[in-house]
Amino acid sequence: TEMISAKGLIYKSPGTAELFATCPEDGPVVVQLFGSEAPFMEAAAGQLRDKGFVWFDCNMGCSVPKVARTGSGAAMCKDIDNALAVAEALIRAAGRGRVGFKLRLGWDEPGRSPAAETWRVLAPALEALGAGWLTLHPRTAKQGFTGTARWEYLSELKALVSLPVIASGDLFTAEDGVRCLAETGVDTVMYARGALRDPAIFKAHLDLLAGREPEVADVATLLARIREHARLARELSTEKVALLKMRTIVPRYIRHIEGSKQLRADIIACRSWDDFEKALHTFEAGKSSSE
């Protein structure tokens, strides 16, 4: 799921419930929680278990300022004792082996912060507590998404623990993901920004692993995918929320199409579903006439 605030869930903040809304086809679903207070995290996991959720992921890697300012996300590496107290509470609520943890390398580089390379302390401690798996984005929190993900740390983590290790960071294409598997020995990868740019990245990944050449979507296929995405968004959400999401998502995965600058602008400016379809149709007609 998207990141869900444990406190927001307990206090029933507007919109929180929609973040873990799902359907049978989604299974198995892993609920991604964040928060820096053990009682709230334990209570949130307990509530979600009562709703039938089984798997959880604790985000200790998000470096977005509004999350880190609360002591959550990547800021948890600044207080190892509290991070482990939160982990213990979550595992107590969900069960051993049912909670994963996302980590960064640390808050900053050695010499710049006392919370440097905290992953080396957290990883084995989380394994001892009963974590089910670990995900590492091999950048510091201060880096955000700048610089280059240092995949060599993924190999080190894999050697340090016996848990499944998931790689994150600079996985923009399926080829990146498969190369990361080969170079680091991790168990699998987690696509984030790469999936926002190309929703078909997961199928392409499986194709490459199976020795098949991934399909390269032409414009007609991509537009059909956008319309299907819009249909599902409207079916699974309110009309207003679905349109807002499509206005945010679609421009990312049409960016590589030649001549799509105006389409991106038109999608972002949409105020209704009629506007949305008109933008697609105008672009489609323009492409057809130029071929």
Give the ranges of each region predicted by the language model.
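Flavin-dependent oxidoreductase catalytic cores
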Residues: 1-291
